[in-house]
């Protein structure tokens, strides 16, 4: 099979009221995977001329000859044709580059002019388009294209000898959906909120994770859903499918078909069509995620979670997690004294997903 990834991006940064960075980039890379006599070989090329592509094929075959036999890894036998809706996921708009530059300058200058803000050390505006195509020798043709417009800013605030820095970002499908004023106000508010923060006494607290920190915590332990980790013997959840592992009020889905999210995926890296999958259902582990190889190993079906880049080998990966709403009201959730967690450090050094 062949993966072709391509992309274009515009990146802008401002400093002290002037444009500091104006960067336009484009890329294209081919990633080939061959299976010969049960052995897998991969190779890639950033050039598209016939000589470069012929060399890529030859290199993949050579690499396969030195690889061990992979009993369960196969090329998809599907001949489906899949394509995302460009009008939905890669819409165009009439915003000019000059207007995007004005947005970038305004974002930095407005935040720099807020009360107690010493400077805006980090900020940026990006307009990114990405495309992926997956082809197989069995006739599969899968194509996706998406656009993401981004803006972010960090403020350094200072009062006397005390300072603090916080940042925030926005993402949208079209540039007019970005709102510099809203971003500036929220970044300023968040930074002022921690300016005079002090350690709290050590004891047990009720805590609420904000949207950012909650996602970070779940990401640290995402490998618990990996069928590849289970196949490799390093997933403690391998034999717990169907068992209770969490509070019965917790249901976690991987929902790649949710178009409001930027993890939308019509198909995975093998070209397998994706679908919504329950990972934790009312506290019980409902499923692991599989590509075709891990699915074959466990005698089950692929869940449409194959991951592979043009330069990498076959793995598994989540698309976009969704936690279903609980039954408690917002007022009851926030009753009493609690801590809201807005920033986490040391997650990977302080957490062991294997144990």
Predicted segments — roles?
Residues 1-275, 281-284:
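Active-site bordering "gate/hinge" segments
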Residues 240-355:
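Dual-mode signal for accessory low-complexity, basic/Gly-rich regions
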């Amino acid at each position: 099979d062949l993966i072709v990834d391509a992309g274009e991006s515009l990146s802008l940064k401002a400093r002290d009221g002037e444009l500091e960075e104006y960067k336009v980039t484009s890329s294209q890379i081919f990633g080939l995977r061959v299976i010969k006599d049960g052995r897998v070989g991969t190779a890639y090329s950033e050039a598209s001329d016939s000589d470069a592509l012929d060399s890529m094929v030859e290199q993949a075959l050579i690499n396969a000859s030195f690889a061990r036999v992979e009993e369960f890894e196969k090329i998809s036998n599907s001949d489906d044709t899949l394509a995302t809706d460009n009008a939905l996921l890669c819409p165009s708009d009439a915003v000019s580059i000059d207007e995007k530059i004005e947005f970038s300058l305004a974002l930095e200058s407005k935040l720099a002019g807020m009360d107690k803000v010493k400077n805006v050390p980090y900020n940026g505006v990006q307009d990114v388009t990405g495309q992926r195509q997956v082809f197989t020798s069995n006739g599969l043709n899968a194509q996706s294209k998406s656009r993401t417009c981004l803006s972010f800013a960090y403020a350094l605030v200072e009062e006397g000898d005390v300072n603090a820095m916080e940042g925030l970002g926005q993402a949208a499908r079209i540039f007019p959906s970005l709102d510099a004023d809203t971003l500036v106000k929220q970044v300023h508010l968040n930074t002022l909120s921690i300016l005079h923060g002090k350690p709290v006494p050590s004891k047990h607290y009720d805590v609420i994770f904000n949207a950012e920190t909650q996602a970070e915590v779940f990401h640290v332990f995402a490998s618990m859903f990996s069928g590849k980790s289970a196949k490799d013997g390093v997933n403690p959840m391998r034999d717990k499918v169907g068992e209770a592992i969490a509070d019965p009020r917790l249901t976690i889905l991987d929902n790649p078909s949710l178009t409001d999210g930027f993890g939308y995926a019509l198909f995975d890296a093998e070209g397998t069509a994706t679908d919504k999958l329950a990972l934790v259902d009312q506290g019980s582990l409902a499923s692991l995620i599989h590509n075709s190889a891990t699915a074959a190993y466990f005698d089950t079906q692929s869940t449409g979670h194959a991951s592979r880049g043009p330069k990498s080998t076959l793995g598994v990966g989540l698309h976009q997690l969704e936690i279903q709403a609980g039954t408690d009201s917002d007022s009851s959730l926030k009753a009493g004294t609690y801590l809201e967690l807005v920033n986490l450090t040391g997650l990977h050094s302080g957490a062991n997903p294997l144990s």
